[in-house]
Amino acid sequence: LRTSSAASDVYKRQEDMLDNTWHDFAEKNLIKIVEINETTSVLELFHGPTAAFKDFGLQLAAAFFNKTLETENKTAIVFGATSGDTGSAAIDACKHFKSIKSFILIPEGNMSEIQRKQMTTVDKSNVFPILADGTFDDCQDIVKEGFKQRSFLKNDQYLLAVNSINWVRIIGQICYYFYAALRSNNLSQPLNFSVPTGNFGNVFACYSASKMGLPLSKIIVAVNSNDILYRFFKENDYSKRDVTETISPSMDISVASNFERLLYDFYLDRNSKVCSDIYSNFPKTAININEDVWQKSDELFLSYSVDDNATYSTMKYFKNEFNYIIDPHTAVAAEAVLKLNH
């Protein structure tokens, strides 16, 4: 009985925390599903305070951070890199908690002006946006090095990640795939999801949902001209190339941080040693896995790479054909659906 009571108390505290987690959303249900035609719908994830889907994962992460810090009477430094939407969503999520100081590295260059202002105009003493030379990958390398060093931390401080390497981010994103399926057909038949991606976190959330029982037919991994994921699913070629600037900058990434999770779970049967060995010489050497193992991709994944010209064309097509405006990232996913006939 004591165990049951304790568990009930934990669940109650979790429910209370979750009830107060997602704030400042313009949509009552947080998410809106818009039917484009009989076979295609758009899952609108832009109704949060920064108009980024990452509001879902990062507001949940910030709530967990704050609860833990309150319990342990500690403070934390949030250290992250951004190609646009991660930084603004992280800053907005963490700015409410005095125990958290946010240091976000911003690459100088290809970023929308509104996202830059979302990060650099927050009037809070615990927010520190840092403009850095180089690309998002360069910023992310600095963050990874910071997590190795940790010498700058005080004794009562934690160092926390807000990029999608943080598992709580993925948890927050798994939820809306179940929501979409429940609202679409009450889980009665498998769905296809086309997901625009760079770092693979949102795709991995969709994959994780399938592992939890969500009926899925295919996950379409939709990328822009930075096509490392497309090359892997198409040709078993996971090799790093220079970043190409596009009109979908949140996906301008040369290496997908969350891909290692898929490799470990889907292809390598959770063999951590084999996974570590494969990554030991990357990115100097491309990752090419055993051909028989790689063939498993066809069970669940499709991929397509969309350049800027096709992105513009798809945005125009959706406006003219459906009177529906989509942003460049959504257009990448939409074009993948059109070309793959899914």
What is each PLM-predicted segment?
Residues 1-7, 11:
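Single conserved hydrophobic/aromatic residue that forms the stacking wall/gate
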Residues 9, 15-46:
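Anion-binding (especially nucleotide phosphate/pyrophosphate-binding) glycine-rich loop
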Residues 41-96:
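Well-ordered mid-protein domain cores that form the structural environment of catalytic cofactors
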Residues 59-70, 93-103, 119-123, 210-216, ...:
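A glycine- and small-aliphatic-rich helix-loop capping segment at beta-alpha/alpha-beta transitions
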Residues 72-90, 102-104, 189-199, 219:
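A short, small-residue-rich loop immediately preceding and capping a beta-strand
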Residues 103-109, 130-131, 217-224:
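Short internal beta-strands
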Residues 115-165, 225-328, 332, 336-337:
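Active-site/ligand-binding loops adjacent to catalytic centers
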Residues 141-145, 150-210, 214:
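Domain-scale recognition of functional cores that engage charged ligands
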